[in-house]
Amino acid sequence: MVHHIVLYKLKPEVTPARIEEMMMNARMQLLKIPEVLSIKCGKRINPELPWPFFIAIDFESMDRYEIFREDPIHVKFMEEVIKPNTAESLALDFEMDPGKDVRFS
C-alpha cells in the first residue's frame, strides 16, 4: 500500500473558513475516485510551524496513484481548490507494507 502525503503552504489571503472548506471539499470530492482507499486532511495546530495544510491518501499501488492523478475529479479539485489557495507544496510517497520492495510499489 502506498501512502501519499502532500504538505501545502497557503496564500496569505486564505482564511480559516476557507481552510475548512478545503478540508470538506477534499474529503467529499476525492473519495469519489475509485483508486482512493482512504483520505485524511487537516490544518496545523502550531502556527509557528510551516505547512499549514495537508492531504494524505492511501492507494493500493503507485499504478493506482497514477490513475488517480489523471481522474477528472482530481484534475478539477486541483484546479478549483488547490491551485487558487496554495503557494507551495511538498509531496511524499511511502510504501506501507513491511518487507515489500519499494521498486514494486
Summary of predicted features, one role per range:
Residues 31-36, 58-92:
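An amphipathic, aromatic/His-enriched active-site/gating alpha helix that lines ligand/cofactor pockets
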Residues 18-23, 75:
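Long, contiguous binding/interaction regions
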Residues 14-20, 64-67:
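Short, conserved charged micro-motifs
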Residues 11-13, 60-62, 97-99:
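Generic structural motif
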Residues 40-49, 79-105:
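Glycine-rich beta-strand-turn "strand-cap" elements at beta-sheet edges
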Residues 3-9, 42-71:
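Short, well-ordered beta-strand segments in beta-rich or mixed alpha/beta enzyme
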Residues 12, 35, 47, 70, ...:
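Generic structural "secondary-structure junction" signal
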